[in-house]
């Protein structure tokens, strides 16, 4: 099976770190209380920041967040098991759009932790549905409601990995919502 996998909020717990750092940045550094909607996944949509404030946040904190992020519970074990079982694992991520240094940091983390196991990595991707279609991905795992709906609407089965306050997807037969890597593993085996 060809499995597409997002990084932030799926393999790494970086989304939780983004939430902590953005709250502190908003309250302490900017002296604001500008949260708009906590259910939004992207901090750019959660806060009422100027483009300059968003870019300053990314420049100052993104490398630190990526370096500090841990693997989601069970992610390493399940991904290695899926690889051993003959599945092809594809990283399909937006990581690297704002800062290419993040790509090298991530590659080094994979090497240092014995997770250099992916068939192919797609970095700085905005249109994940196109990559899934072009690579004939059987199922994509992502934590973004928008990405899951877009990918599913293009015909690729999708696992919506929820681990934070966010919107639900209830009306798309190509999307299943799961909450941890144990559930993902069970679901993938039930698909076969």
Model-inferred region functions:
Residues 6, 92-94, 161:
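Short hydrophobic segments within beta-strands
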Residues 133, 183-192:
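Short amphipathic alpha-helix with an adjacent loop that forms part of the alpha/beta core around
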Residues 137-176:
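Acidic, Mg2+-coordinating phosphoryl-transfer loop and its flanking beta/alpha structural elements
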């Amino acid at each position: 099976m060809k499995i597409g996998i997002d990084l932030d909020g799926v393999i790494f717990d970086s989304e939780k770190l983004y939430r902590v750092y953005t709250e502190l940045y908003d309250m302490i550094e900017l002296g604001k209380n500008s949260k708009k909607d906590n259910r939004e996944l992207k901090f750019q949509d959660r806060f009422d920041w100027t483009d300059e404030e968003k870019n300053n946040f990314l420049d100052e904190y993104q490398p630190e967040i990526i370096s500090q992020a841990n693997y989601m519970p069970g992610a390493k074990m399940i991904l290695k098991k899926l690889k051993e079982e003959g599945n092809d694992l594809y990283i399909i991520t937006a990581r690297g759009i704002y800062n290419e240094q993040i790509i090298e940091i991530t590659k080094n983390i994979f090497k240092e932790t014995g997770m250099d196991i992916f068939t192919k990595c797609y970095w700085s991707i905005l249109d994940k549905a196109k990559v899934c279609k072009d690579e004939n991905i059987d199922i994509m795992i992502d934590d973004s409601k928008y990405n899951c709906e877009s990918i599913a609407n293009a015909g690729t089965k999708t696992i919506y990995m929820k681990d934070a306050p966010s919107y639900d997807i209830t009306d798309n037969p190509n999307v299943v919502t799961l909450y941890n890597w144990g559930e993902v593993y069970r679901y993938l085996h039930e698909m076969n």
